[in-house]
Amino acid sequence: MRTSVNVYAGGVTLVWVTGNSGTGKSTVCGVLRARGYVALDADEDGFCRWIDRATGEVVVDPPDPVPGGWLDRYGWAIVRERVETLVEESRSRIAFLCGSAENEADVRDLFDLTVCLVIDEDTLRHRLATRTTNTFGRHPEELAAALKWNPRMRAIHETGGATVIDASKPVTEVVDNVIDAVQGLTGSTP
């Protein structure tokens, strides 16, 4: 198990840990925190929000579960200004931001490394049906969206140069692989 507390990683300051719904981003975030890293969950720590794609307006109280057709109009978006603030706060230590948003390309330039967690369809179905920390994916429309995006996420991030990690493995191994990706980029343990 690799552990560290706020260590500057040879110039790498901000790592984006992304992947489809159900790949384990929030779980990885929690383990990174437990190991002493600065790790933030984009879903829980105010980095993302629902927006109306037609108007750009923020959705203050989104429905849960979403009704049919809702995801065609509304999207989960990351707020660039929040990530820019995190970049400034992370100049002397490494930080991990864990999440996924449809406008990730708008903030990709702010990250020193992108890690994409991937899982197979059976694992995705199982995780979305049984997870207790987030209800997204239990409703048929949400599940359909997650299944549609699962193969696309890997392709998008591989093309963009991300480090792809098989997140169907035990979480400690997945987190070790995330840390190894940072070490591989910097030549030192984060």
Predicted regions and their residues:
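Glycine-rich phosphate-binding loop used to anchor ATP phosphates in small-molecule kinases
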Residues: 66-111, 117-118
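ATP-binding Walker
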Residues: 23
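Small-molecule kinase domains that catalyze NTP-dependent phosphoryl transfer to phosphate-bearing small molecules
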Residues: 104, 130-180, 185
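Conserved substrate/cofactor phosphate-moiety recognition/catalytic segment
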Residues: 30-81
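Walker A/P-loop
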Residues: 26
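Hydrophobic anchor at the beta1->P-loop junction of P-loop NTPases
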Residues: 17
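P-loop (Walker A) phosphate-binding loop of NTP-binding proteins
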Residues: 20
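Conserved phosphate-donor/acceptor-positioning beta-strand/loop module used by diverse small-molecule
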Residues: 110-131
